[in-house]
């Protein structure tokens, strides 16, 4: 294996993933103990949120809950899964994405109730808003694909089915289950999930009020500026971290 587990190995990345898990929970996308985030580390390994003997849920994730495993779920360094830690049952959901999508480095899997409810109600995630959430609108342009099976994605075959439904899109819904978001960074993957959840919530509100969902006109879409990564990701992420800091 070449190295021994230490909380100081990839310490910054472990802490970043732990904070991202807490953001998911604080935003209501990962209630309880379900959900996980991973980050590619090198060619054949990833840091992933694991479950230990004192599991308390994503809202209480610490850097020590983030462990380094290989693409088959084995410890990628000596001691990584010691202390009663285990990789998620749905690790193949992460590893198959990392195997097949070289464009992504981070994967988020969460169970947002509003996303599940909107999909079960037959409401697709569409670009129904404009400047309200420009990155979310662009993400939803053309719709967000759906993997139509409500299964636990616990093996490579099921993960391959999910990837087939996802195509080259950044997010896929899992019917009766949740969503998977993939991006170049942990922060971007979480922000994408938040945008999809927000659009799902708005869709439920609009239809509950008797309204009809309409896509943003192409002419309006063309007018939406690209505010750049420093605003769309970096500033937005500072806000998310400030929210959880204030909550604590």
Curated annotation (Swiss-Prot):
GO terms for biological process: pentose catabolic process. Induction: Constitutively expressed. The active site is at residue 90. It comes from the Bacteria. It holds the Pfam family Aldolase_II. Keywords: Lyase, Metal-binding, Plasmid. GO terms for molecular function: aldehyde-lyase activity; metal ion binding. It is an enzyme of class 4 (lyase). InterPro entries: Aldolase_class_II_sugar_metab, Aldolase_II/adducin_N, Aldolase_II/adducin_N_sf. SUPFAM superfamilies: AraD/HMP-PK domain-like. Optimum pH is 7. Pathway: Xenobiotic degradation; phthalate degradation. Its cofactor is a divalent metal cation. Its EC number is 4.1.1.69. GO terms for cellular component: cytosol. A divalent metal cation binds at residues 90, 109, 111, 177. It catalyses: 3,4-dihydroxyphthalate + H(+) = 3,4-dihydroxybenzoate + CO2. PANTHER family: 3-OXO-TETRONATE 4-PHOSPHATE DECARBOXYLASE-RELATED, FUCULOSE PHOSPHATE ALDOLASE. Catalyzes the decarboxylation of 3,4-dihydroxyphthalate to protocatechuate (3,4-dihydroxybenzoate) during phthalate metabolism. Belongs to the aldolase class II family. This is 3,4-dihydroxyphthalate decarboxylase. The lineage of its organism: Bacteria, Bacillati, Actinomycetota, Actinomycetes, Micrococcales. The gene is phtC.
